[in-house]
Amino acid sequence: MSRRSVTKKRVVPPDAVYNNRLLSMTIRRVMKSGKKSLAARIVYDALDIIKERTGSDPIEVFETAIRNLTPLVEVKARRVGGATYQVPMEVRQGRGTALALRWLIGYARQRSGKSMAIKLANELMDAANETGGAIKKREDTHRMAEANKAFAHYRY
């Protein structure tokens, strides 16, 4: 373990169009090979598709989706006397958001469809309605934590 001082958290600047930090984080996650303008176009197109289909505020749908995807508990491997236990741990807010974004974009990429904007929009709308692959991943994570509740006393 490092003996250096704790690193300072970087402040994520909000995005240019909606002035939203969470959206800026999403754009950075969608980005591949440093192509940020393309990633931004994909995310904004996805929000336009959501607005077109639902008729409601796309930022509200987006934030609801992220809130629904954020896990409360996860399991971490802990080695105790030759055996490895899956120990349930509470998820900190920053990590929970990061996991939610990772799952959202991962399952959007796996979807079959024409463009990434359409796939991302569909995954966001599904997550807001508590369906879809990313929600299933969150439920699996919670189920794993529940199944391994007996090892909660190994928390560190």
Swiss-Prot record:
InterPro entries: Ribosomal_uS7, Ribosomal_uS7_bac/org-type, Ribosomal_uS7_CS, Ribosomal_uS7_dom, Ribosomal_uS7_dom_sf. GO terms for cellular component: small ribosomal subunit. The keyword Electron transport does not apply. Keywords: Ribonucleoprotein, Ribosomal protein, RNA-binding, rRNA-binding, tRNA-binding. GO terms for molecular function: rRNA binding; structural constituent of ribosome; tRNA binding. PANTHER family: RIBOSOMAL PROTEIN S7. Part of the 30S ribosomal subunit. Contacts proteins S9 and S11. One of the primary rRNA binding proteins, it binds directly to 16S rRNA where it nucleates assembly of the head domain of the 30S subunit. Is located at the subunit interface close to the decoding center, probably blocks exit of the E-site tRNA. This is Small ribosomal subunit protein uS7. It comes from Picosynechococcus sp. (strain ATCC 27264 / PCC 7002 / PR-6). The gene is rpsG.
